[in-house]
Amino acid sequence: MMTESILQIRDLSVYYNQKKTLKDVSLDLYPNEITALIGPSGSGKSTLLRSINRMNDLNPEVTITGSIVYNGHNIYSPRTDTVDLRKEIGMVFQQPNPFPMSIYENVVYGLRLKGIRDKSILDHAVESSLKGASIWNEVKDRLHDSAVGLSGGQQQRVCIARVLATSPRIILLDEPTSALDPISAGKIEETLLLLKKDYTLAIVTRSMQQASRLSDRTGFFLEGDLLECGPTKAMFMNPKRKETEDYISGKFG
């Protein structure tokens, strides 16, 4: 019996200044899976990711057609509350971006925006979120130190904890390890594999090894087209498209 998808993208196109940069993409995300989005720079991976929680709305030169259905509703409906949407569909960026405040305040930032002031609720959220991001033991004795003073890898895990604190169902990650050293990147990967037990994840990555290690499904993008999508093992062992095979084998990138 096939698992029902948690989010359905249908015929999604994105235009920047009337130039079509994402072309009629259809893709599903499935619960408790990691989907990797691979392809050369400028192929549309990050554009798709930013469309899933409407980050592209912040650019007035962007036009979007098609649909993304989550919880039975098209997220591009005028009735969609984008603040609530981004709590349900969180995002972690390429460069760690902790706010210039304490580790504690970074994690509870979204909760405070929701009006939560109860210290016991905030304390519990901080501990559970930092544990979820696999960094609690490293920072539990310095929660009121500035998050900016942490290493790059620790900062990125605090950013993951900040997303977890709002209780999302889907976590989007845009090359979350590309700015990190290999050891820090490895810790992030271990964290993501643990998180997929409770969340749905989609990750943009330039590393074929990372996509192979982490993901259950992979989508290959080229010049705005989703050329191929399917189970990662099958795609890496027997890609259906020559372009996919050439990219995975490093013939272009």
Swiss-Prot record:
Q: Which UniProt keywords apply?
A: ATP-binding, Cell membrane, Membrane, Nucleotide-binding, Phosphate transport, Translocase, Transport
Organism from which the protein derives: Streptococcus pyogenes serotype M12 (strain MGAS2096)
Gene Ontology biological process terms in this record = phosphate ion transmembrane transport
Summary of subunit composition and partner proteins: The complex is composed of two ATP-binding proteins (PstB), two transmembrane proteins (PstC and PstA) and a solute-binding protein (PstS).
Query: How does this protein sit in the membrane?
Result: Peripheral membrane protein
**Which InterPro entries does the UniProt entry name for this protein?**
AAA+_ATPase, ABC_transporter-like_ATP-bd, ABC_transporter-like_CS, P-loop_NTPase, PstB-like
Q: Which CDD domains match?
A: ABC_PstB_phosphate_transporter (cd03260)
Q: Which domain of life is it from?
A: Bacteria
Q: What GO molecular function annotations does the UniProt record carry, in alphabetical order?
A: ATP binding; ATP hydrolysis activity; ATPase-coupled phosphate ion transmembrane transporter activity
Keyword presence, ATP-binding: yes
The catalysed reaction is: phosphate(out) + ATP + H2O = ADP + 2 phosphate(in) + H(+)
Q: Name one GO cellular component term.
A: plasma membrane
Task: Using the UniProt record, name the top-level EC class of this enzyme in a single word.
Answer: translocase
NCBIfam families referenced in this protein's UniProt entry, alphabetically: 3a0107s01c2
List of residues binding ATP:
G39, P40, S41, G42, S43, G44, K45, S46
Q: Chief subcellular site?
A: membrane
Q: Which Pfam families match?
A: ABC_tran
Q: In its UniProt entry, what is this protein called?
A: Phosphate import ATP-binding protein PstB 1
